[in-house]
Structure formats: C-alpha cells, structure tokens
Amino acid sequence: MNRQFAIPLDDIIIRRLKSDPEFATEMFKSSVESLFEGDFHYALRMLRCIVKAGIGFTALSKAVGISSQNLHRALSDRGNPTIRTLNKILTAIADFLGIPRPQPSFS
C-alpha cells in the first residue's frame, strides 16, 4: 500500500533547513559523503532541498554560470551531472552555507 502523506517529506526537510543552519550544514556534509559512497539519488535529492531552502536555483544559476533549467535537471531524481557541474554546485552551496573549503595536503 502506497501511503500519501499530508506534507511531502521534502517540504518538511526544506522547512527544517530554512530554520536550522546547523542542520543545513550537516545535510550538506551528509550529501557529499553519500556521493563518495555511491548513493547518488540521496545526495542529489538532499542537495536539491538545500538549494530550494537557501540559495535558490536562480542565485545558484548566476553563481555557477549554468542555466536554472539545467540545474533543475542535474539535481532531479534522474539527474546525472558531470563532475565539473557537481563541483560548481557543491562549491556554491558550501560558500552560501559558510563552509570553508578544505585545503589539499600532500605528504
């Protein structure tokens, strides 16, 4: 049986993201970890929620130089963004959230 909820899960997550910056930061970190673990569907879904709750697709489009339509497509359930596109998106979201970029260390 497929249940329909009164409020879609993404909407609940977006509300929490808007009201809790720490949650947004942790969600972003979790999304990046999910990318490394190969759980692309989860990662793209959470990144999409973070964008909707914060920076927005229009501002993200301006920040990364990719049309809003292509960003929607890249972060959709069927999205398959290139590494270059994903890097631009992750960098812009991290900047928006105030997450410092790690510096590579070569030993």
What is the role of each PLM region?
Residues 1-44:
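N-terminal flexible/basic segments that precede or flank functional cores
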Residues 1-3, 102-107:
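Intrinsically disordered, low-complexity and often Lys/Arg-enriched segments
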Residues 21, 25, 40, 57, ...:
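Alpha-helix N-cap/helix-initiation sites
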Residues 40-54:
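Short, amphipathic alpha-helical "recognition" segments used to contact nucleic acids or chromatin
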Residues 53-72:
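Short alpha-helical DNA-recognition segment
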Residues 76-77, 94:
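Residue-level detection of the helix-turn-helix DNA-binding "recognition helix"
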Residues 83-100:
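DNA major-groove recognition helix of helix-turn-helix/homeodomain DNA-binding modules
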